[in-house]
Amino acid sequence: MFDIHREELDWGGRTLVLETGKMARQADGAVFASYGDTTVLATVVSAREPKPGQDFFPLTVNYQEKTYAAGRIPGGYFKREGRPSEKETLVSRLIDRPIRPLFADGYKNDTQVVVTVLAHDLENDPDVLSMVAASAALTLSGVPFMGPIGGARVGFVGDEYVLNPTIEELKDSALDLVVAGTSDAVLMVESEAKELSEEVMLGAVMFGHRHFQPVIEAIIRLAEKAAKEPRPFEPVDHSALEAKIREIAEADLRAAYKIKQKQARYEAVGAAKSKVKKYFEQLAIDGQEAPKAQDVAEVLKGLEAKIVRWAILDDGIRIDGRDVKTVRPIVSEVGILPRAHGSALFTRGETQALVVATLGTGEDEQFIDSLEGTYKEHFLLHYNFPPFSVGETGRMGSPGRREIGHGKLAWRAIHPMLPAKHEFPYTLRVVSEILESNGSSSMATVCGTSLSLMDAGVPLKSPVAGIAMGLILEGEKFAVLSDILGDEDHLGDMDFKVAGTESGVTALQMDIKIAGITEEIMKVALAQAKDGRAHILGEMSKALTSARAELGEHAPRIEVMKIAVDKIREVIGSGGKVIREIVEKTGAKINIEDDGTIKIASASGDSIKAAINWIKSIASEPEVGAIYDGTVVKVVDFGAFVNFFGSKDGLVHISQLSKERVAKSSDVVKEGDKVKVKLVGFDERGKTRLSMKAVDQTTGEDLEAKAKSEKDAAKEGDEAGAAE
């Protein structure tokens, strides 16, 4: 019944299995893959014909995690998987990016890749396995895919690279890098690093490339046994159409691409395209054969690319007049918004990001439910890209895949530089509002995030900057571009984003639109990016060089204290009664952890102090000889009862009210008076004895200790005089 084909190999100390012929047989390609006990199913279906009028390649990649894969039931009311999580969106992009450039030019058939996680051993992350399985399914499917590709994760522990580190091993790694590519070249890199050098990063990329070659060979062996017949596909020859369009509009397009200002350039390019469109419309009106509008648009795009690319390769001059290494003018400003905890406006050429940092408490942490379990995230970074940023109208609403991906890249760049949570116990939310975009808005977000966090008083280990690099490659000739424009991104061959500090790289993302690039090109790009990053950090330092000494005026203050674990129940109280009363009366937010750590937060220092004193009064005992603030709660003939140390009450005997003789207690104090008392001890019945006369009521100084100190000093003086 089943025609099963299977390939196995030992890869990084674990067995990788690729199998086809048993599951999802009606898909064009289907591969059941496992690594350790993590298992995925990848399927590919591609339409037989493109939709009429289709002018782009409609590739969709859906990565989905099923909670049964980890033996869990989904949370929530409906108890089934819902909209894609951030992780699912990011892995979908991770798979999409290296496979997209390998489809044949001109192929426009609707194509869907679906990868489903069926089992997760909680050791091996399914993302790389999913990429490998998708590559294998595409290779078997018969669609015009110029693969296969391989992929690998690389860690860096103790100055050594680690192939496919487990989830636990990654916790000790200074690097989390995923690389994908063909047997000849690298196509995609995604990474987070702890200030590693460019040499280490490049070494990691090439280490991963070498070690996924056996995977590519296994996919080829599987394809030799089980691949479907290649689909017939012949790209349309547009050479005659291109010659005509060159005749009509090449001169106008060349002139347009010498205009440095984006909007003016777009208007000139639009005018040239309109001229072409009108020419072919007139042909149709005259009854002559006219090409399809989508073919005209495709040829025009190719002509634009050639004009821009050869101007750079031949003359070293870019669209806006810069040479290949120059970064656009930068303006950095902080403290832009009056009520925000931290804010920055970062402008680089025609790209601008308004970035706002907000500090919160443990209650504000994001609860994340993943296959690995549930946890809380205290650093959130949200990237918004409204249509007005590029002078267009468009959809507004929940973030798309691109916004989620760009936000996560900026998150990776900043995350290694955050202070340890126990040193800075705040929840951090950063929002980047892209106000203008002409290339590299994600790297503007990195720069703005660094500035806004420092403006909020967050003690980053070092400022972080990011830069986007581009590539123009024709045969053996290439040019690496620093700080690319949007047009250079669209018309170029690479989008290579590098973020880091003066000391090293913290994040690296690379997407290639051609069949891959070599180690030499990556080496040039990394070196050029390092110079650009240093320049940007210098420009940022004109606004702020390090975190402000104090938190923002409107930010909450957090104090941390610790109590014995067996006292937690008393602080919380029956049904939370006690903790609710403390919060209500003091106005502070209180978070109690299982180990007895308590975080008290409020914008008011008095509120925090009151909450701390209240908790101390429950969880600990007052110390004999210590001085406390108190309130007179009752005046009696023989003294006054004073509330102190939270909810503790003690008696100040009439003889302890004042140094002077007191006839009536009410002559010295009355109910509600704020006083300072010293705990002098306990009577035989365990009742607390307090003294007011032992304390200076203005300064809180211990008068008994002061008198003793003066007496001891005088005695030492007498003894010294006698000795003489």
From Swiss-Prot:
Which cellular compartments is it found in? Cytoplasm
- Provide the top EC class: transferase
The record's region (Disordered) falls at 691-724
Q: Which cofactor is recorded for it?
A: Mg(2+)
State the Gene Ontology BP annotations: mRNA catabolic process; RNA processing
Catalyzed chemical reaction(s)? RNA(n+1) + phosphate = RNA(n) + a ribonucleoside 5'-diphosphate
Does the entry feature the keyword Transmembrane helix, yes or no?
no
Q: What is its main location?
A: cytoplasm
Disulfide partners: none
Basic and acidic residues biased stretches: 703-718
What positions does the domain S1 motif occupy?
Answer: 625-693
Entry superkingdom: Bacteria
Q: Which residues bind Mg(2+)?
A: D489, D495
Q: What are the protein's UniProt keywords?
A: Cytoplasm, Magnesium, Metal-binding, Nucleotidyltransferase, RNA-binding, Transferase
GO cellular component terms attached to this protein's record: cytosol
Q: Which GO terms describe its molecular function?
A: 3'-5'-RNA exonuclease activity; magnesium ion binding; polyribonucleotide nucleotidyltransferase activity; RNA binding
Under Enzyme Commission nomenclature, its number is: 2.7.7.8
Domain KH residue range list: 556-615
HAMAP family in the record, alphabetically?
PNPase (MF_01595)
The job of this chain, per UniProt, is described as: Involved in mRNA degradation. Catalyzes the phosphorolysis of single-stranded polyribonucleotides processively in the 3'- to 5'-direction.
The family classification in the record reads: Belongs to the polyribonucleotide nucleotidyltransferase family.
This protein's name: Polyribonucleotide nucleotidyltransferase
Organism of derivation = Azorhizobium caulinodans (strain ATCC 43989 / DSM 5975 / JCM 20966 / LMG 6465 / NBRC 14845 / NCIMB 13405 / ORS 571)
Q: Which gene encodes it?
A: pnp
